[in-house]
Amino acid sequence: MKNFLVLVCVVGLPFYVLSQSYYQWVERADSCIKAKDWAGAESALVSALRTEPANGQNSLLMSNLGTVQRYAGNYEAALRSYTNGLLMTPHSVTLLRNRAALFSEIDSIDRAYQDYSQILLIDDTDEDALYHRGLIALERGDTISSRADFERILKLNPASANGRIGFASLLKVMGYYPEAIEVYSQVIRVNPEKEILYVGRAEAYLFAGQYAKADKDIGKAIELAPDDPVVYVLRALGKLARYERESAKADLKRAVELGYDSKEAERLLEEE
């Protein structure tokens, strides 16, 4: 604190001026974020950090900076920001959660798994971390660990939608399609506007060969989230299963326009 006061005297500016400048940058960043002006938000956050590099709130700003950079598609910068924030506050669940989400987005699932596990060392009742770690375990083929995480969620909160969605995903992977469909249906009755539920149930319907029901769920998912590329990929898979190649190709093209990997789309077409 003494060093900080000396710095203020040297530069000849009163504390309130520096503080005001810092919070003005923070407010500007907030306005840019609301307007989805990611470049403006990044610039404002960096300016705030430079204005008061010792401010105790900088860990939170680093988290916000990382998220802004992530939304802008600058994943390397986002990773640096989250990691630098964790150097300031190693036990920040918010930073760990944000970095885990970024790792998942860039397919670094092992590192995402580690961050979610770190969150659970801090708070073993964190439902979000249990849910996402369970999904990653499922993606890795570890159904035992996946089931343990989903069971833990339901033990903590028997009414948890995440716990039930996790179990439905587990049942689907294990080939128990009717059971998975039933669990999805139970959750949909309580959460009728949640797009991911219709996507999950539609996939189970596709695997079960119930294409008409899958189409209905996909239609609802598109109504709820028309910019989600996964929905169009799912619809394309249903069409490919019925040899509707040209229509499926159009859906995959739309998915790529929305951000789906073009090489993966080509691979799906080649497999059929």
Feature map (PLM): residue ranges:
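Register position in tetratricopeptide repeats
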Residues: 34-35, 68-71, 105-106, 139-140, ...
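Structural marker of alpha-solenoid helical repeat scaffolds
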Residues: 51-54, 88, 122, 156, ...
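Canonical tetratricopeptide repeat
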Residues: 60-64, 98, 132, 166, ...
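TPR alpha-solenoid repeat register
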Residues: 58-61, 95, 129, 163, ...
